[in-house]
């Protein structure tokens, strides 16, 4: 989710405060953006990157980190900044798809040869399957994993109880939470 914040400046150096997994993406994207900016405006632009956990980055902006752009993992992280007045209310409505500039894909990694024949979400709730996933309380990406599982459960079951049952079984099979932040 992206949003502009901070004051406008005459300089051509901007700071993008973002979350960890976007570091390499923005290293490449900033080169393309600088070329575009030069072609469009005839001026050079430099983008300074700041990366960390999405929630930590949001708090750093609230506490005074000078961000021209924030590209954080979760809506509530940007809303935290909005609540301080650093971002105008209604930022979500400024662009398509709730101002989310990118999406994510969930991938299942399995043991060599896929001995448990895992191919879909339902396979992850079977007895004997061990799931390793980041703790949804620890990172934006982990929340995306949870939301992907919830979306699957909702598509499959109209019953909220069945959805909760699916999620309960999935996380009961989580033998380890990895912490990404």
Feature-to-residue mapping (PLM):
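N-terminal segment of the mature folded domain
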Residues: 8-138
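Short helix-loop capping/hinge motifs at secondary-structure junctions, enriched
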Residues: 113-119, 152-159
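C-terminal motif of bacterial Sec signal peptides marking the signal peptidase cleavage site
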Residues: 3-4
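Conserved small/polar residues in nucleotide/adenosyl-binding loops
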Residues: 178-181
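Extracytoplasmic surface signature
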Residues: 161-174
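Internal, well-ordered alpha-helical segments in soluble enzyme and binding-protein domains
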Residues: 104, 117-120, 142-149, 166
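Extracytoplasmic/periplasmic solute-binding protein
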Residues: 129-155
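Short helix-coil transition/hinge motifs at the ends and kinks of transmembrane helices
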Residues: 40-43, 156-161
